[in-house]
Amino acid sequence: MAEHSFDVKAVIKDFPILEQKVNNKRLAYLDSTATSQTPVQVLNVLDDYYKRYNSNVHRGVHTLGSLATDGYENARETVRRFINAKYFEEIIFTRGTTASINIVAHSYGDANISEGDEIVVTEMEHHANIVPWQQLAKRKNATLKFIPMTKDGELQLDDIKATINDKTKIVAIAHVSNVLGTINDVKTIAKIAHEHGAVISVDGAQSAPHMALDMQDIDADFYSFSGHKMLGPTGIGVLYGKRELLQNMEPVEFGGDMIDFVSKYDATWADLPTKFEAGTPLIAQAIGLAEAIHYIENLGFNAIHQHEKELTEYAYEQMLTIDGLEIYGPPKDRRAGVITFNLADIHPHDVATAVDTEGVAVRAGHHCAQPLMKWLGVSSTARASFYVYNTKEDVDQLVQALKQTKEFFSYEF
Protein backbone atom coordinates (compact mmCIF):
# COMPACT_ATOMS: atom_id res chain seq x y z
CA MET A 1 0.00 0.00 0.00
CA ALA A 2 1.38 3.43 -0.93
CA GLU A 3 2.70 5.50 1.93
CA HIS A 4 0.70 8.60 0.96
CA SER A 5 -2.60 7.06 -0.10
CA PHE A 6 -5.06 4.26 0.56
CA ASP A 7 -8.08 2.84 -1.22
CA VAL A 8 -10.96 4.60 0.51
CA LYS A 9 -13.51 2.34 -1.18
CA ALA A 10 -11.80 -0.67 0.37
CA VAL A 11 -11.71 1.10 3.72
CA ILE A 12 -15.45 1.80 3.60
CA LYS A 13 -16.13 -1.91 3.11
CA ASP A 14 -14.48 -2.54 6.50
CA PHE A 15 -17.21 -0.55 8.29
CA PRO A 16 -20.52 -2.47 8.25
CA ILE A 17 -22.45 0.42 9.81
CA LEU A 18 -21.84 2.54 6.71
CA GLU A 19 -23.80 0.10 4.54
CA GLN A 20 -27.12 1.16 6.03
CA LYS A 21 -29.45 3.86 4.80
CA VAL A 22 -30.72 6.65 7.05
CA ASN A 23 -34.11 8.08 6.14
CA ASN A 24 -33.82 6.11 2.89
CA LYS A 25 -30.61 7.97 1.98
CA ARG A 26 -27.02 6.77 1.94
CA LEU A 27 -25.38 7.44 5.29
CA ALA A 28 -22.83 10.25 5.26
CA TYR A 29 -21.33 9.97 8.74
CA LEU A 30 -19.60 13.27 9.52
CA ASP A 31 -19.39 13.06 13.31
CA SER A 32 -16.14 11.21 13.96
CA THR A 33 -14.90 13.97 16.25
CA ALA A 34 -17.56 12.79 18.70
CA THR A 35 -17.17 9.06 18.03
CA SER A 36 -15.58 7.24 15.12
CA GLN A 37 -17.03 4.12 13.56
CA THR A 38 -15.51 0.69 14.17
CA PRO A 39 -14.02 -1.55 11.46
CA VAL A 40 -14.87 -5.22 11.20
CA GLN A 41 -11.30 -6.12 12.19
CA VAL A 42 -11.88 -4.59 15.63
CA LEU A 43 -15.34 -6.15 15.90
CA ASN A 44 -13.79 -9.54 15.12
CA VAL A 45 -11.14 -9.38 17.85
CA LEU A 46 -13.79 -8.37 20.39
CA ASP A 47 -15.94 -11.28 19.28
CA ASP A 48 -12.95 -13.61 19.45
CA TYR A 49 -12.11 -12.51 22.99
CA TYR A 50 -15.60 -13.12 24.32
CA LYS A 51 -16.00 -16.41 22.46
CA ARG A 52 -12.58 -17.91 23.05
CA TYR A 53 -10.70 -16.55 26.09
CA ASN A 54 -12.96 -14.31 28.17
CA SER A 55 -11.35 -14.31 31.62
CA ASN A 56 -9.90 -12.00 34.23
CA VAL A 57 -6.24 -11.10 33.98
CA HIS A 58 -2.99 -11.27 35.95
CA ARG A 59 -3.83 -13.57 38.88
CA GLY A 60 -5.31 -16.58 37.14
CA VAL A 61 -3.01 -19.49 36.32
CA HIS A 62 -5.44 -21.30 34.03
CA THR A 63 -5.18 -21.19 30.24
CA LEU A 64 -7.95 -18.67 29.58
CA GLY A 65 -6.57 -16.32 32.22
CA SER A 66 -3.12 -16.52 30.68
CA LEU A 67 -4.48 -15.81 27.20
CA ALA A 68 -6.46 -12.82 28.47
CA THR A 69 -3.42 -11.49 30.35
CA ASP A 70 -1.26 -11.82 27.25
CA GLY A 71 -3.86 -10.02 25.14
CA TYR A 72 -4.21 -7.21 27.67
CA GLU A 73 -0.50 -6.64 28.22
CA ASN A 74 0.26 -6.97 24.51
CA ALA A 75 -2.28 -4.18 23.99
CA ARG A 76 -0.34 -2.04 26.44
CA GLU A 77 2.85 -2.64 24.49
CA THR A 78 1.03 -1.76 21.26
CA VAL A 79 -0.01 1.57 22.75
CA ARG A 80 3.49 2.22 24.10
CA ARG A 81 4.99 1.69 20.68
CA PHE A 82 2.21 3.68 18.97
CA ILE A 83 3.04 6.84 20.94
CA ASN A 84 6.76 6.03 21.41
CA ALA A 85 6.64 6.07 25.19
CA LYS A 86 9.91 4.97 26.76
CA TYR A 87 8.55 2.47 29.28
CA PHE A 88 5.50 0.16 29.37
CA GLU A 89 4.83 1.39 32.93
CA GLU A 90 3.95 4.78 31.45
CA ILE A 91 0.79 3.42 29.79
CA ILE A 92 -2.28 3.43 32.05
CA PHE A 93 -5.59 2.12 30.71
CA THR A 94 -8.55 4.26 31.79
CA ARG A 95 -12.20 4.76 30.86
CA GLY A 96 -11.30 7.55 28.44
CA THR A 97 -9.70 10.97 28.06
CA THR A 98 -11.91 12.50 30.74
CA ALA A 99 -10.94 9.85 33.29
CA SER A 100 -7.27 10.25 32.39
CA ILE A 101 -7.29 14.01 32.90
CA ASN A 102 -9.12 13.65 36.20
CA ILE A 103 -6.47 11.23 37.47
CA VAL A 104 -3.81 13.84 36.76
CA ALA A 105 -5.83 16.65 38.36
CA HIS A 106 -6.57 14.69 41.52
CA SER A 107 -3.39 12.68 41.98
CA TYR A 108 -0.68 14.98 40.67
CA GLY A 109 -2.60 18.22 41.15
CA ASP A 110 -3.65 17.75 44.76
CA ALA A 111 -0.10 16.85 45.76
CA ASN A 112 1.70 19.60 43.86
CA ILE A 113 -0.57 22.66 43.72
CA SER A 114 -0.55 25.16 46.58
CA GLU A 115 -2.23 28.46 47.33
CA GLY A 116 -1.13 31.14 44.89
CA ASP A 117 0.07 28.72 42.23
CA GLU A 118 -1.18 29.09 38.67
CA ILE A 119 -2.75 26.57 36.29
CA VAL A 120 -2.75 27.59 32.62
CA VAL A 121 -5.39 26.49 30.08
CA THR A 122 -7.08 27.99 27.00
CA GLU A 123 -10.65 28.91 26.11
CA MET A 124 -10.69 26.35 23.31
CA GLU A 125 -10.61 23.43 25.76
CA HIS A 126 -13.25 20.73 26.06
CA HIS A 127 -15.03 20.91 29.43
CA ALA A 128 -13.10 17.79 30.45
CA ASN A 129 -9.90 19.84 30.23
CA ILE A 130 -11.26 22.89 32.04
CA VAL A 131 -13.52 21.71 34.86
CA PRO A 132 -10.98 19.37 36.57
CA TRP A 133 -8.53 22.29 36.71
CA GLN A 134 -11.25 24.70 37.89
CA GLN A 135 -12.04 22.34 40.74
CA LEU A 136 -8.36 21.84 41.56
CA ALA A 137 -7.85 25.61 41.66
CA LYS A 138 -10.82 25.95 44.03
CA ARG A 139 -9.57 23.16 46.31
CA LYS A 140 -6.11 24.69 46.55
CA ASN A 141 -6.95 28.39 46.26
CA ALA A 142 -4.84 28.54 43.11
CA THR A 143 -5.38 30.72 40.02
CA LEU A 144 -6.68 29.50 36.66
CA LYS A 145 -5.23 31.49 33.75
CA PHE A 146 -6.10 31.44 30.05
CA ILE A 147 -3.73 31.90 27.12
CA PRO A 148 -5.37 34.47 24.77
CA MET A 149 -6.42 33.34 21.30
CA THR A 150 -6.19 35.13 17.97
CA LYS A 151 -9.33 35.98 16.01
CA ASP A 152 -8.91 32.64 14.19
CA GLY A 153 -8.76 30.68 17.43
CA GLU A 154 -5.03 30.03 17.41
CA LEU A 155 -2.27 30.63 19.97
CA GLN A 156 0.61 33.03 19.42
CA LEU A 157 4.05 32.28 20.85
CA ASP A 158 4.30 35.70 22.54
CA ASP A 159 0.98 35.15 24.33
CA ILE A 160 2.06 31.69 25.48
CA LYS A 161 5.31 33.07 26.87
CA ALA A 162 3.49 35.96 28.55
CA THR A 163 1.00 33.66 30.29
CA ILE A 164 3.31 30.89 31.54
CA ASN A 165 5.62 32.08 34.32
CA ASP A 166 7.40 30.88 37.44
CA LYS A 167 4.08 30.67 39.31
CA THR A 168 2.75 28.22 36.73
CA LYS A 169 2.70 24.65 37.98
CA ILE A 170 0.48 22.93 35.38
CA VAL A 171 -0.24 23.74 31.73
CA ALA A 172 -3.28 21.85 30.40
CA ILE A 173 -3.95 22.14 26.70
CA ALA A 174 -5.62 20.35 23.80
CA HIS A 175 -3.31 19.14 21.06
CA VAL A 176 -6.20 19.67 18.61
CA SER A 177 -9.41 21.62 19.31
CA ASN A 178 -12.56 19.52 19.00
CA VAL A 179 -14.45 22.61 17.79
CA LEU A 180 -12.09 24.83 15.82
CA GLY A 181 -9.70 22.22 14.48
CA THR A 182 -6.82 24.33 15.78
CA ILE A 183 -3.57 22.35 15.98
CA ASN A 184 -1.48 23.54 18.91
CA ASP A 185 2.31 23.31 19.00
CA VAL A 186 2.41 21.26 22.19
CA LYS A 187 6.12 20.50 21.84
CA THR A 188 6.99 24.20 22.03
CA ILE A 189 4.47 24.77 24.82
CA ALA A 190 5.98 21.84 26.76
CA LYS A 191 9.44 23.38 26.41
CA ILE A 192 8.21 26.73 27.73
CA ALA A 193 6.39 25.05 30.62
CA HIS A 194 9.48 23.08 31.59
CA GLU A 195 11.64 26.21 31.50
CA HIS A 196 9.45 27.53 34.32
CA GLY A 197 9.39 24.27 36.27
CA ALA A 198 5.81 23.41 35.29
CA VAL A 199 4.40 20.18 33.90
CA ILE A 200 2.20 19.92 30.82
CA SER A 201 -0.90 17.75 30.51
CA VAL A 202 -2.09 17.34 26.92
CA ASP A 203 -5.63 16.42 25.86
CA GLY A 204 -4.92 14.23 22.85
CA ALA A 205 -8.45 13.02 22.16
CA GLN A 206 -8.51 14.71 18.74
CA SER A 207 -4.85 14.17 17.83
CA ALA A 208 -4.19 10.48 18.53
CA PRO A 209 -6.62 9.33 15.79
CA HIS A 210 -5.15 11.60 13.14
CA MET A 211 -1.43 12.18 13.59
CA ALA A 212 1.71 10.29 14.55
CA LEU A 213 2.65 10.86 18.19
CA ASP A 214 6.07 10.67 19.82
CA MET A 215 6.02 11.22 23.57
CA GLN A 216 9.79 11.36 23.81
CA ASP A 217 9.91 14.08 21.16
CA ILE A 218 6.92 16.10 22.40
CA ASP A 219 8.20 15.73 25.98
CA ALA A 220 4.70 15.92 27.45
CA ASP A 221 4.49 14.97 31.11
CA PHE A 222 0.96 13.61 30.72
CA TYR A 223 -0.98 12.79 27.54
CA SER A 224 -4.56 11.51 27.39
CA PHE A 225 -6.68 10.02 24.62
CA SER A 226 -9.69 7.76 23.95
CA GLY A 227 -10.23 4.60 21.93
CA HIS A 228 -13.69 5.41 20.59
CA LYS A 229 -12.41 8.38 18.58
CA MET A 230 -9.78 6.26 16.81
CA LEU A 231 -11.78 3.29 15.48
CA GLY A 232 -11.72 1.45 18.80
CA PRO A 233 -14.37 0.43 21.34
CA THR A 234 -16.09 2.81 23.73
CA GLY A 235 -15.09 2.81 27.38
CA ILE A 236 -11.31 2.65 26.88
CA GLY A 237 -8.76 5.41 27.13
CA VAL A 238 -5.08 5.92 27.81
CA LEU A 239 -3.17 8.03 30.26
CA TYR A 240 0.49 8.38 29.38
CA GLY A 241 2.61 9.78 32.17
CA LYS A 242 6.35 10.02 32.63
CA ARG A 243 7.43 7.13 34.82
CA GLU A 244 9.15 9.27 37.43
CA LEU A 245 5.99 11.34 37.89
CA LEU A 246 3.61 8.38 38.06
CA GLN A 247 5.84 6.60 40.58
CA ASN A 248 5.44 9.49 43.01
CA MET A 249 1.67 9.88 42.52
CA GLU A 250 -0.98 8.31 44.73
CA PRO A 251 -3.82 6.28 43.20
CA VAL A 252 -7.31 7.78 43.17
CA GLU A 253 -9.29 4.52 43.04
CA PHE A 254 -8.76 1.49 45.21
CA GLY A 255 -9.35 -2.25 44.91
CA GLY A 256 -8.45 -5.18 42.70
CA ASP A 257 -5.03 -5.53 41.12
CA MET A 258 -3.81 -2.12 42.25
CA ILE A 259 -3.46 -3.59 45.75
CA ASP A 260 -0.11 -5.04 46.89
CA PHE A 261 -0.92 -5.94 50.51
CA VAL A 262 -3.82 -5.22 52.85
CA SER A 263 -3.82 -5.38 56.65
CA LYS A 264 -6.72 -4.48 58.90
CA TYR A 265 -5.83 -0.80 59.00
CA ASP A 266 -3.57 -0.10 56.04
CA ALA A 267 -2.65 -1.13 52.53
CA THR A 268 0.19 -0.80 50.05
CA TRP A 269 -0.03 -0.40 46.30
CA ALA A 270 1.15 -2.45 43.36
CA ASP A 271 3.85 -1.15 41.05
CA LEU A 272 3.14 0.77 37.86
CA PRO A 273 1.12 0.60 35.74
CA THR A 274 -1.28 -1.52 37.80
CA LYS A 275 -1.30 1.04 40.63
CA PHE A 276 -3.72 3.19 38.62
CA GLU A 277 -5.91 0.37 37.24
CA ALA A 278 -8.29 -0.46 40.08
CA GLY A 279 -10.85 -3.24 39.73
CA THR A 280 -11.30 -5.57 36.79
CA PRO A 281 -9.43 -3.94 33.90
CA LEU A 282 -10.90 -2.98 30.54
CA ILE A 283 -9.66 -6.20 28.97
CA ALA A 284 -11.76 -6.56 25.82
CA GLN A 285 -11.65 -2.82 25.22
CA ALA A 286 -7.85 -2.70 25.46
CA ILE A 287 -7.54 -5.60 23.02
CA GLY A 288 -9.95 -3.83 20.67
CA LEU A 289 -7.98 -0.59 20.95
CA ALA A 290 -4.79 -2.41 20.00
CA GLU A 291 -6.47 -3.79 16.88
CA ALA A 292 -7.71 -0.29 16.00
CA ILE A 293 -4.12 0.94 16.28
CA HIS A 294 -2.98 -1.83 13.94
CA TYR A 295 -5.66 -0.75 11.46
CA ILE A 296 -4.56 2.90 11.62
CA GLU A 297 -0.90 1.96 11.26
CA ASN A 298 -1.70 -0.18 8.22
CA LEU A 299 -3.24 2.85 6.52
CA GLY A 300 -0.35 5.07 7.63
CA PHE A 301 -0.53 8.53 9.14
CA ASN A 302 0.91 10.21 6.06
CA ALA A 303 -1.94 8.80 3.99
CA ILE A 304 -4.52 9.61 6.67
CA HIS A 305 -3.27 13.19 6.90
CA GLN A 306 -3.34 13.68 3.14
CA HIS A 307 -6.83 12.17 2.85
CA GLU A 308 -8.25 14.35 5.63
CA LYS A 309 -6.48 17.47 4.35
CA GLU A 310 -7.97 17.10 0.88
CA LEU A 311 -11.45 16.43 2.26
CA THR A 312 -11.32 19.31 4.74
CA GLU A 313 -10.13 21.84 2.17
CA TYR A 314 -12.73 20.65 -0.32
CA ALA A 315 -15.51 20.86 2.27
CA TYR A 316 -14.32 24.28 3.43
CA GLU A 317 -14.46 25.66 -0.11
CA GLN A 318 -17.80 24.06 -1.00
CA MET A 319 -19.51 25.10 2.22
CA LEU A 320 -18.48 28.72 1.79
CA THR A 321 -20.39 28.84 -1.51
CA ILE A 322 -23.56 28.87 0.61
CA ASP A 323 -24.70 32.41 1.42
CA GLY A 324 -24.98 33.05 5.14
CA LEU A 325 -22.76 30.14 6.17
CA GLU A 326 -19.98 31.07 8.60
CA ILE A 327 -17.06 28.78 9.45
CA TYR A 328 -15.21 29.23 12.75
CA GLY A 329 -11.53 28.67 13.38
CA PRO A 330 -8.28 28.73 11.40
CA PRO A 331 -7.98 28.87 7.59
CA LYS A 332 -8.47 25.64 5.65
CA ASP A 333 -4.74 24.90 5.42
CA ARG A 334 -4.09 25.22 9.18
CA ARG A 335 -6.83 23.08 10.66
CA ALA A 336 -7.54 19.46 11.44
CA GLY A 337 -10.43 17.58 9.82
CA VAL A 338 -13.26 19.41 11.55
CA ILE A 339 -15.43 22.29 10.33
CA THR A 340 -17.66 24.06 12.82
CA PHE A 341 -20.21 26.41 11.29
CA ASN A 342 -23.54 28.19 11.49
CA LEU A 343 -26.18 29.05 8.91
CA ALA A 344 -27.51 32.57 9.39
CA ASP A 345 -30.87 32.74 11.19
CA ILE A 346 -31.16 28.93 11.51
CA HIS A 347 -30.54 27.23 14.84
CA PRO A 348 -27.75 24.61 14.68
CA HIS A 349 -30.07 21.93 16.05
CA ASP A 350 -32.49 22.66 13.22
CA VAL A 351 -29.60 22.41 10.77
CA ALA A 352 -28.51 19.03 12.17
CA THR A 353 -32.08 17.72 12.19
CA ALA A 354 -32.70 18.88 8.64
CA VAL A 355 -29.53 17.38 7.14
CA ASP A 356 -30.23 14.13 8.99
CA THR A 357 -33.35 13.73 6.85
CA GLU A 358 -30.91 13.60 3.93
CA GLY A 359 -28.79 10.91 5.59
CA VAL A 360 -26.08 13.28 6.85
CA ALA A 361 -24.88 12.94 10.44
CA VAL A 362 -23.37 16.10 11.95
CA ARG A 363 -23.15 17.31 15.54
CA ALA A 364 -24.99 20.34 16.93
CA GLY A 365 -24.66 22.10 20.27
CA HIS A 366 -21.87 23.64 22.32
CA HIS A 367 -19.67 20.55 21.85
CA CYS A 368 -18.72 20.53 25.55
CA ALA A 369 -16.97 23.86 25.01
CA GLN A 370 -19.20 26.58 26.47
CA PRO A 371 -16.35 29.02 27.24
CA LEU A 372 -15.34 28.78 23.59
CA MET A 373 -18.94 29.36 22.46
CA LYS A 374 -19.00 32.52 24.57
CA TRP A 375 -15.69 33.60 23.02
CA LEU A 376 -17.19 33.04 19.55
CA GLY A 377 -20.28 35.01 20.54
CA VAL A 378 -22.72 32.16 19.88
CA SER A 379 -24.64 29.70 22.04
CA SER A 380 -24.08 26.71 19.78
CA THR A 381 -22.84 25.61 16.38
CA ALA A 382 -23.07 22.73 13.92
CA ARG A 383 -19.98 20.62 13.27
CA ALA A 384 -18.87 18.29 10.49
CA SER A 385 -15.78 16.15 10.90
CA PHE A 386 -13.90 13.75 8.66
CA TYR A 387 -12.03 10.49 8.98
CA VAL A 388 -10.59 7.67 6.91
CA TYR A 389 -13.95 6.39 5.60
CA ASN A 390 -15.25 9.75 4.38
CA THR A 391 -15.30 10.85 0.73
CA LYS A 392 -16.06 13.89 -1.39
CA GLU A 393 -19.44 12.28 -2.00
CA ASP A 394 -20.15 12.70 1.72
CA VAL A 395 -19.17 16.37 1.47
CA ASP A 396 -21.36 16.90 -1.59
CA GLN A 397 -24.26 15.26 0.23
CA LEU A 398 -23.72 17.61 3.18
CA VAL A 399 -23.51 20.72 1.00
CA GLN A 400 -26.65 19.78 -0.93
CA ALA A 401 -28.49 19.12 2.34
CA LEU A 402 -27.38 22.48 3.71
CA LYS A 403 -28.62 24.25 0.58
CA GLN A 404 -31.98 22.52 0.92
CA THR A 405 -32.11 23.46 4.60
CA LYS A 406 -31.43 27.10 3.81
CA GLU A 407 -34.10 27.07 1.10
CA PHE A 408 -36.66 25.45 3.42
CA PHE A 409 -36.12 27.95 6.24
CA SER A 410 -36.21 30.85 3.78
CA TYR A 411 -39.65 29.85 2.54
CA GLU A 412 -42.44 32.18 3.61
CA PHE A 413 -45.46 30.16 4.65
Swiss-Prot record:
Catalytic reactions on record: (sulfur carrier)-H + L-cysteine = (sulfur carrier)-SH + L-alanine
Kindly list the positions at which N6-(pyridoxal phosphate)lysine occurs in this protein. Answer: K229
* A GO biological-process term: cysteine metabolic process
Q: Which residues form the active site?
A: C368
A GO molecular-function descriptor: cysteine desulfurase activity
Keywords for this protein:
Pyridoxal phosphate, Transferase
Q: What is its EC number?
A: 2.8.1.7
Against SUPFAM superfamilies, the record matches this protein to:
PLP-dependent transferases
Q: Which cofactor does it need?
A: pyridoxal 5'-phosphate
Using the record for this protein, list the coiled-coil segments as residue ranges, or answer none: none
Q: Which domain of life is it from?
A: Bacteria
Please name the top-level EC class of this enzyme: transferase
Q: What does this protein do?
A: Catalyzes the removal of elemental sulfur and selenium atoms from L-cysteine, L-cystine, L-selenocysteine, and L-selenocystine to produce L-alanine.
Family the UniProt entry places it in? Belongs to the class-V pyridoxal-phosphate-dependent aminotransferase family. Csd subfamily.
The protein here is known as: Probable cysteine desulfurase
Q: Which organism is it from?
A: Staphylococcus epidermidis (strain ATCC 35984 / DSM 28319 / BCRC 17069 / CCUG 31568 / BM 3577 / RP62A)
Q: Which gene encodes it?
A: csd
